[in-house]
């Protein structure tokens, strides 16, 4: 089972990322548009992988990741952002997929982080 949590405040982008995650092998997805929703969603169902934007309308992607990992332990994170340089140095151990991205680049990065074939 591979549950993916998408943290993205642009609904169309979030929906596209969730669809690509399912195409790439995720068995389920959840979408959170705020830092608070992300933490609630992760606590409700522990994700196998997190796909996260850096900037959110309410909150901050890296802050949401920090809270989730502090609560749930290690989870692979793939930042998907148009501004990779804004990803904090403390989070650069996680991978970054710059927007815009190709379907093939997403599939490859997702499968690597999710541990899928």
Where are the predicted features?
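Acidic, metal-coordinating helix/loop segments flanking the phosphotransfer/catalytic sites
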Residues: 31-49
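Hydrophobic/aromatic residues positioned on beta-strands within the core alpha/beta folds
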Residues: 80-81
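C-terminal output helix
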Residues: 101-114
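Acidic catalytic/metal-coordinating carboxylates
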Residues: 34, 60-63
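Active-site residues of response regulator receiver
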Residues: 53-54
């Amino acid at each position: 089972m591979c549950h993916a949590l998408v943290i993205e405040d642009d609904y169309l982008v979030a929906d596209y990322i969730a669809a690509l995650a399912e195409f790439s092998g995720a068995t389920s997805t959840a979408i959170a548009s705020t830092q608070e929703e992300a933490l609630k969603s992760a606590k409700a169902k522990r994700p196998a992988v997190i796909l996260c934007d850096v900037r959110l309308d309410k909150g901050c992607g890296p802050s949401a990741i920090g809270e989730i990992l502090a609560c749930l332990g290690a989870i692979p994170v793939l930042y998907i952002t148009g501004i990779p340089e804004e990803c904090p140095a403390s989070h650069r151990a996680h991978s970054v997929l710059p927007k815009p991205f190709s379907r093939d680049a997403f599939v490859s990065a997702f499968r690597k982080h999710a541990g899928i074939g």
